[in-house]
Design a protein with these regions (language model features):
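Conserved catalytic motifs of ABC-family nucleotide-binding domains
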Residues: 57
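Hydrophobic anchor residue at the start of the ABC signature
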Residues: 50
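Conserved ABC ATPase "signature" region
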Residues: 3, 7, 14-32
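C-terminal coupling/interaction segments
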Residues: 167-204
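ABC transporter nucleotide-binding domain
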Residues: 79-166
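Conserved ABC ATPase signature
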Residues: 36-40
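Catalytic Walker B motif of ABC-type/P-loop ATPase nucleotide-binding domains
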Residues: 61-65
């Protein structure tokens, strides 16, 4: 079936067979080359459908929920194939509710809810736009002093670990200076929201 689809796009029989074999092996279906789609598991059927979309080496690839029904290993395999195609210059567009995968793969994002675009743009710009003044501190000393620090709202605290919000950036710099004075600081960094957190924010 995959060979037939390649033939429809002008491949010779030999080239179609070679291309179909290569993409199926790349997607982890090398041992199932002669099987009918109906005999495959749902996850393998999904991978076979992706192979059908890729076999003619399209320059624009539009996929609807390509990771649906896949186990974590298969997700990584398919993600790697899509990244490889994008690196070769193909435009890869896909919809997905698996936001951790979307965040890992995509350079540009569009969040749609109720038929309306709620947010769109480069991934890092969206993260910056929806960032709060939240910081994480990891130090050798006890970070309990943060609970009484002006302009600081403690979110989580455990010994030398603290997650907290500040009212302004100047407060964050003041906190860092005191943290250094209190003991060795292993890490002090702003916390950017995940795509899942941005999604929840923009659809509310």
């Amino acid at each position: 079936q995959i060979v037939y689809l390649a033939r429809l796009h002008g491949f010779s029989k030999a080239d179609a067979t070679a291309e179909a074999t290569a993409i199926l092996e790349q997607l982890g279906l090398g041992e199932r080359l002669g099987d009918n789609v109906e005999t495959l598991s749902l996850g393998n059927q999904q991978r076979a459908q992706i192979a059908a979309a890729l076999v003619h080496d399209p320059q624009v690839l539009i996929l609807d929920e390509p990771f649906s029904g896949l186990d974590p290993i298969a997700v990584d395999v398919v993600a790697g194939v899509l990244q490889e195609r994008a690196a070769r210059g193909a435009a890869v567009i896909f919809s997905s509710h698996q936001l951790d995968v979307v965040e890992r793969l995509c350079d540009d994002l569009v969040i749609i809810a109720g038929g309306t675009i709620r947010a769109a743009g480069p991934r890092e710009r969206l993260r910056d736009e929806h960032s709060t003044r939240r910081y994480e501190l990891i130090s050798s000393g006890d970070a309990g002093w943060l609970r009484t620090e002006p302009g600081v709202e403690m979110i989580n605290f455990d010994g030398g670990y603290a997650l907290f919000d500040v009212d302004e950036e100047a407060t964050a710099q003041r906190v860092l200076r005191r943290a250094v004075a209190e003991g060795d600081v292993a890490s002090f960094a702003p916390q950017h929201p995940t795509l899942a957190q941005i999604f929840k924010e923009v659809i509310q």
